[in-house]
């Protein structure tokens, strides 16, 4: 992502969006926008707009954050070891904007790969299926057909 475009987008973020995506913060469980979303659509990076996750892969993990079994395209997320807070975890960041998204854990549904991408709502923008074309994401309509 172009630095000037990224800086422009960063200035448009709310405090919580900035804290989560740029300072690896975490929003409160069960008190965020998408933890219980049941509308069909895709989730894009709040900074770059790149598609990251689909509601088809979202499930209720009971943790209070949106949880997914996989990203739409693995090339759009970067995973690396996170040793903060006295834990060993795997951080998930967006590849294009280097935004902190959340963490991935090996305790997801076994029949869907066994992973749980636990993602902060503040790092995402949701595009419902009926708005995909209008928002320029028409290529992703096929996911829901």
Curated annotation (Swiss-Prot):
Question: PROSITE patterns under this entry?
Answer: MSRB
An example Gene Ontology cellular component term from the record? cytoplasm
Molecular functions (GO terms): peptide-methionine (R)-S-oxide reductase activity
Annotated SUPFAM superfamilies: Mss4-like
Q: Which reaction does it catalyse?
A: L-methionyl-[protein] + [thioredoxin]-disulfide + H2O = L-methionyl-(R)-S-oxide-[protein] + [thioredoxin]-dithiol
Instruction: Give the GO biological process terms.
Output: protein repair; response to oxidative stress
Please name one Pfam family that this protein belongs to. SelR
Q: Which UniProt keywords apply?
A: Oxidoreductase
* InterPro entries, sorted: Met_Sox_Rdtase_MsrB, Met_Sox_Rdtase_MsrB_dom, Mss4-like_sf
Name the Gene3D superfamilies for this protein: Peptide methionine sulfoxide reductase (2.170.150.20)
Positions of the catalytic residues? 118
What the entry lists under NCBIfam families is as follows: peptide-methionine (R)-S-oxide reductase MsrB (TIGR00357)
Give the UniProt family note: Belongs to the MsrB Met sulfoxide reductase family.
Checking PANTHER family in the record gives: METHIONINE SULFOXIDE REDUCTASE (PTHR10173), PEPTIDE METHIONINE SULFOXIDE REDUCTASE MSRA_MSRB (PTHR10173:SF59)
Task: Tell me what this protein is called.
Answer: Peptide methionine sulfoxide reductase MsrB
